[in-house]
Design a protein with these regions (language model features):
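N-terminal pre-ligand scaffold of iron-sulfur
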Residues: 3-73, 100-117
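Short, acidic, Ser/Thr-enriched surface-loop or helix-capping motifs
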Residues: 87-88
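Short cysteine/histidine-rich metal-coordination sites, predominantly Zn2+-binding motifs
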Residues: 74-81, 92-102
Length: 117
């Protein structure tokens, strides 16, 4: 399955700073996403909505494949077995073979920055 409209960054080429800063708030528009790496190297994807920000690790809970955001369907989809997760419902599995939601990454807005919470 080709993921037309999927995020182009596979592993998140932006790392979290030592002070837990992920990205300046102005760099992620409402409705946008931002790909980054956690301090342990795990890939993650941040979402910004009208009401705030949230993020998930993007390693599939089935067999560890990479889940990429498929914007037209508003789902994170694993490239290995097409497991699908709804980022707007706490990373809930909407199509198997995965049976666990994606791990939540706690984030917050602090001043002009999106940070690890």
């Amino acid at each position: 399955m080709a993921l037309v409209g999927a995020s182009t960054s596979l592993l998140g080429n932006h790392a979290v700073a030592a002070n837990n800063q992920i990205v300046n708030l102005s760099k992620v528009k409402v409705g946008g996403t931002y790909s980054f790496q956690l301090k342990n190297g795990a890939p993650a994807l941040l979402f910004r909505t009208k009401t705030g920000v949230f993020a998930y690790q993007t390693i599939c809970t089935h067999e560890g494949g990479l889940a990429k955001y498929f914007a037209p369907r508003k789902l994170l989809v694993c490239a290995v077995h097409n497991a699908s997760f709804d980022p707007f419902k706490k990373g809930k599995v909407v199509a198997g073979p995965a049976n666990k939601p994606l791990p939540i990454v706690k984030v917050a807005i602090k001043g002009e920055w999106i940070v690890l919470a």
